Amino acid sequence: MLLEAGPQTLGELVALSGLGLAPVRRALLVLVQHGMVHCHQPAPGAKDAPPPRRRKDGSVTQQYVYEVCLPRMLHALLRTPTVLVKARDEMGEVTEKILETLMEHGRLTLGQLRACVAPKLGATEGGEVPEKVGEQLDIEFVALANAHFIEQAPTTATPPPWVRNKPNLPAAASGATAKSKGVSTAVDSVNQYYYAGASRYNQVRFQLPPGLEARVRGLVAAGKVNPQKRKWVTLSEGQDYGDDGGLSPMSIDGGTEDEGRNGVWGSADGHAAVQWRVNFDEFNRRFRHAACVKLVRQKLGARAATVVEAMLASGRRFETKVDESRSVPLSVQDVYSTLRESGSSMSLEEVGAELEDLNDDPLELISLVGDTPGGVAFCVNMGRILDYRKLKEVEAGVRDRFGPLALRIFRLLFLKRQLEQKQIADMAMIPTKETREILYRLLRHEYVILQEISRSTDHAPTRTFYLWRVDVGTVAKRYMNDLLFVGGNLVHRLQHEMKKGERVIDAAQAALASQDSASGSTRVGLLMETHKEQFNQMKRMVASLETLLHRCDDAIALFADY
């Protein structure tokens, strides 16, 4: 209903669904808990704000609005294995367990997270977490927060992500009429409301409880743990969590004074009630950088990829959004210092020469910005790199779906912008009849556009030009829709195979339970062999489907998130 009808209040959802208040409320609790629905209060005076609700005591309150978070839904359904593997490779298995627990439960307080992760590590003594395991969990949690892999769950005072990402809108022109000035004032007021909410959230988004930060620093200073070159960020004290203490009215019960009395996990200073969740934006940023490095390695070699990887890693903390078109400008000395810290043996002259070669390359993957106090500065054109990858992905899809001749026509139209049918047939060296069939197949699936330019008012075919062209933006959206459709089919097929495997296991258990005689043992043995073969076949099918789903998710991320 939220996908079809858009943002709705609780009362509107109850009326649309035909269900009672209690079932709708429980469903929203689960969806908000897992981040698939965002609950917030629209700005006063906003055009889409619902009317205030009057309570029985006569007071008037602003209603909450519920919206679907489609990107986070796709991340939770498709990208969970990739995220867990990334976390395990960079920070170890304990970090993987923490993120896995957060994905299972959506959002948790520190005390709840500790109670859920400790049993997975096999370290519980009478229902309590040992001190050594608690220290390890503290360290890993701080490392995750400093790496921005986890974040505080947004409150109801926080606008939705699609509003937070673009808080500043252009103001009205100076020569506007009185009416337009009034509209502009209202729009500015709404923008300021959303911007203030986003600013409050960004200030505390990765803020750790002061007690936890101090405890981990003490453990590192005492030499009880190996920090593995992790940089602990000193957070300024005195920052509050907003008027609502970091909790939304739709969240589950937060921490209390009695929760996790050991250490600072259960401290009653207000921080124990803050809930945490996985920050998919940071993982998407890492995957985006890895995709850029992969393309540079394929086109220009390992040394160029090493330099680009160092530039992206050094400027990552300065990026304000995931889809930045250019990286932060870095001088040759800055890039060289980053490479030295990562253990590279490249000299300063080699780094400078590699950057010059990248700047002179026709692909323009790196651009010269200018002179800085540290020398000549360069930046990585991430937008251009990813556009090139998207084009190659679309071309691969056209070739697989329509054949090599269709790919030849698609590339020709992309290079020449617009051509007539006869020109396409001549340049592509394809018969006219076959060219027409391929063009109309591509047109039917929205991979090309046909534009009619008439020289007369009667639009007679003999006096009309029919121009074929490729709109890369439209094709990219169409291809992404096809990928989402394929991903949905793979998920449904995977669920079907898993249910089939459960039925095979149930049948095998029933056959074992019915074994009651020596004569029947042979029959049961044959049945078990059949069930074993069916189960192995199901395992191979599930492995193939998971591999295909992983590849499909990589392509979806390229078009939807990068």
Please state what every model-predicted region is.
Residues M1-L2, T95-L102, A304-M311, A406-L413:
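Hydrophobic residues on short alpha-helical segments
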Residues A27, E140, V307, E354, ...:
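Residues in the recognition helix of alpha-helical DNA-binding motifs
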Residues V24, L28, G134-L137, L348-V351, ...:
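Helix-turn-helix DNA-binding helix
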Residues V32-G45, D138, V142-T158, M250, ...:
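A short, conserved structural fragment
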Residues P52-E100, T158-D243, P249-T256, G260-L295, ...:
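Short, amphipathic alpha-helical interaction segments positioned at domain boundaries
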Residues M1-K47, Q63-V65, Q537-R540, S544-H550, ...:
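Eukaryote-specific detector of the first structured module of a protein
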Residues E4-S17, H105-P130, V307-V308, R317-S345, ...:
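Short acidic, hydrophobic short linear motifs in intrinsically disordered regions
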Residues H445, N489-Y562:
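Long low-complexity, intrinsically disordered regions
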